Structures are given as structure tokens and as C-alpha cells.
From Swiss-Prot:
J domain boundaries: 5-65
Cofactor note: Binds 2 Zn(2+) ions per monomer.
Annotated function: Participates actively in the response to hyperosmotic and heat shock by preventing the aggregation of stress-denatured proteins and by disaggregating proteins, also in an autonomous, DnaK-independent fashion. Unfolded proteins bind initially to DnaJ; upon interaction with the DnaJ-bound protein, DnaK hydrolyzes its bound ATP, resulting in the formation of a stable complex. GrpE releases ADP from DnaK; ATP binding to DnaK triggers the release of the substrate protein, thus completing the reaction cycle.
Domain of life: Bacteria
Assembly information from the UniProt record: Homodimer.
GO cellular component: cytoplasm
An individual GO BP term: DNA replication
Protein name: Chaperone protein DnaJ
Cystine residue pairs: none
Species assigned in the record: Lysinibacillus sphaericus
GO molecular function terms noted in the UniProt entry: ATP binding; heat shock protein binding; unfolded protein binding; zinc ion binding
Length: 368
């Protein structure tokens, strides 16, 4: 679905954005605002306006945010939040220009959980269950934080707005600097009698069991989203989401690269030279593989569709079998004699076996 223009969505013109930029830049200019962090806020405002005023930059931000467009799946947490920069955009789009209702429903925070899974579980998928610590809305006060039978009172400092205005004299005239109310910490409410269960927090931590469907073909570092299993919402808002990142354990015999699996097949010299038909293990069971005569070490064979099912449903990967010809470390006298005969027939006679360096030097001096 094509994204609509920010200005069209919000009913704002570019002139109005420019006015908002001028207002915010004056409000947070380091020469005018001495509060900690004002200089960083000023830089973010300038950066945000630079993006909004350039159609190409705005289009890239719409699509990728601050993430590298070349990054792989699962590179970011939830593919989302842009931190303070997003707050600046909110200011341009009316969030900073108008008072936000601190009592309005807000979505809860997202959670992230790392889950270790076996090699085979990642390939074939699995239905399982995890238990995680997470905050839940307090059942005693139903999230208000107040003792049952009482209600939070409106903050008298900010009159429930959650923010207060501070007049600042500047060379441009008197300006109003808006900041979070320090009395109610931006909530707009004061809890005089706190709930004994949650101690005024409105939420309690519990251990919750959650069913998880591991998708077949998931790879190390990829993640899935479990909707509504994050932190509880605020003021009746929806719960956040749970992002599960998978850490896939290695395997003794197989190596995985994307949807393909690699296996090293060890062959004896006779098998490689004469050829053979052997059973090769795959994650789907054993299959027969014909080894042609004269196969060299490093030769590779493909077993079609014996790899991993693509997690997005785009077919199956393959298994690649790489040959490694093993050289015997210990030989009997009979085996040595046969190899010498083979070498003579091949015209490739090796140096005399069994002679030490001292014996070779001695024979040299004796003219032998």
C-alpha cells in the first residue's frame, strides 16, 4: 500500500510546517534555552525539518526510518521506534503544538525475548510454550494505582494537563517553554492513597505462559511478533507486542547458509578412485548418492530440495555434499606393498620408505 503524504494525512501545509519549525527552533535554541538537552533537541529539530522539507529524504524516511535499507530480516527491534527524532516529528505534526491529554489511552511498551531453539526446530518449526516475566494490569485497582474506593486527584500544579508552561524572556520577546510537570511526572494525576497491591504503579509483575509457534525455516537472528503480549496499555490503551528473537543452536554434522544445508562426506581413497553408491544423511532422512569413479577431494554434489523450507514460503533449499578424501594414517605392510605396486604401474614411484635422515646421509657419503 502506497503511503500518503504526511501533510495530506494531517491536513497541514508546508507553510504551517515551516512556522512550527521556526517556533520550535526558537524555543530550543541553545542561546535561549539553558535546560539540559536543549541543544540536542535543537539539532534534532533542524534535522527533522531538513527531512520534511525534502521530498526525496522524506520518502526514504517513510520507507526505512533510521534503519539501513540493506539490513537483513530481524536486524532491528520490531522494525520500529525512532526515539527522540520521532518525538520531533510529532511536534511538527501537532503533538508539540497542542497539549496532549495525559489521560488519553496509550499503547503499552513492546517487549523482546530471546529464545534458544535446536537446529531441527528451526528447520521444521514447532508449537511450544514460554514463560516470561511481564507486567500485568493490577487487578486490585484496575490500573488506576489508587486504593480501592478512592480515585486519583487532578494535579493542582498543571491542572491535569501533565505539562506546565514557563515564560522565558528572549531577544525575540517573551516565549513560553513547555515541559513535563514535575509534581505529577506528566500524568496529570496525584495518587494520595496508593493501592497496596501495586504500590501506586497500576501494574504488577507476573510470570506468564505464552504459546509460541516457531515458523518452519526460521534462521538465527530472525524474530516474530506476538501481538498484544507486551506491557499493558496506559489509561485503558491496548497492550504492546512481544518480539521473539531466535537463537539457533549449531549441529554436529550440518551447516546452514540461508535455506541451504552443507554436509562434508568423508571417502576412502578406493571409494573416490573406483566410485561407490553410499547413503548420505540429510535433515529429511538418508538418501543414496552415487559417487563417480575418479572423484576428487573438494568435489560437490547437490541434493535438490533436501535443504530448508523458506520461512516466507518461497520453495525449498538444497543440500550440498562436499567430498573429503581421507588419507590413511597407518598402513600394514601388505597395504604398503600394494600401494608401491600401484605407484610403479602409474609411473609415480615414491622415495624409499622407512629410511631415516641419518641413513640417507650415510648412504650419500658412501656413494650408494
Amino acid at each position: 500500500m502506497e503511503k500518503r503524504d504526511y501533510y495530506e494525512v494531517l491536513g497541514l501545509t508546508k507553510d504551517e510546517i515551516k512556522k512550527a519549525y521556526r517556533k520550535l527552533s526558537k524555543q530550543y535554541h541553545p542561546d535561549l534555552n539553558k535546560e539540559p538537552g536543549a541543544d540536542e533537541k535543537f539539532k534534532e529539530i533542524a534535522e527533522a525539518y531538513e527531512v520534511l522539507s525534502d521530498d526525496q529524504k522524506k520518502a526514504r524516511y517513510d520507507q526505512f526510518g533510521h534503519e539501513d535499507p540493506n539490513a537483513g530480516f530481524g536486524g532491528g527491534f520490531g522494525g520500529g521506534g525512532f526515539g527522540g527524532f520521532e518525538d520531533i516529528f510529532s511536534s511538527f505534526f501537532g503533538g508539540g503544538g497542542r497539549r496532549q491529554d495525559p489521560n488519553a489511552p496509550r499503547k503499552g511498551d513492546d517487549l523482546q525475548y530471546r529464545m534458544n531453539i535446536k537446529f531441527e526446530e528451526a528447520i521444521f518449526g514447532k508449537e511450544t510454550e514460554i514463560e516470561i516475566p511481564k507486567d500485568e494490569t493490577c487487578e486490585t485497582c484496575h490500573g488506576s494505582g489508587a486504593k480501592p474506593g478512592t480515585q486519583p486527584e487532578t494535579c493542582s500544579t498543571c491542572n491535569g494537563a501533565g505539562q506546565i508552561n514557563q515564560a522565558v524572556d528572549t531577544p525575540f520577546g517573551r516565549m513560553m517553554n513547555r515541559r513535563s510537570c514535575t509534581t505529577c511526572h506528566g500524568t496529570g494525576k496525584i495518587i494520595k492513597e496508593k493501592c497496596s497491591t501495586c504500590r501506586g504503579e497500576g501494574k504488577v509483575q507476573k510470570r506468564k505462559k505464552i504459546k509460541v509457534s516457531i515458523p518452519a525455516g526460521v534462521d538465527d537472528g530472525q524474530q516474530i511478533r506476538v501481538s498484544g503480549q507486551g506491557e499493558p496499555g496506559i489509561n485503558g490503551g491496548p497492550a504492546g507486542d512481544l518480539y521473539i528473537m531466535f537463537r539457533v543452536q549449531g549441529h554436529n554434522d550440518f551447516e546452514r547458509d540461508g535455506d541451504d544445508i552443507y554436509f562434508e562426506l568423508k571417502l576412502t581413497f578406493p571409494q573416490a578412485a573406483l566410485g561407490d553408491e553410499i547413503e548420505v544423511p540429510t535433515v529429511h532422512g538418508k538418501v543414496k548418492l552415487r559417487i563417480p569413479a575418479g572423484t576428487q577431494s573438494g568435489a560437490q554434489f547437490r541434493l535438490k530440495d533436501k535443504g530448508v523450507k523458506n520461512v516466507h514460503g518461497y520453495g525449498m533449499g538444497n543440500q550440498y555434499v562436499t567430498v573429503k578424501v581421507m588419507t590413511p594414517e597407518k598402513l600394514t605392510e601388505k597395504q604398503k606393498q600394494l600401494l608401491r605396486e600401484f605407484a610403479e604401474i602409474s609411473g609415480d614411484i615414491p622415495e624409499e620408505q622407512g629410511s631415516s635422515l641419518f641413513d640417507k646421509i650415510k648412504k650419500k657419503f658412501q656413494g650408494e
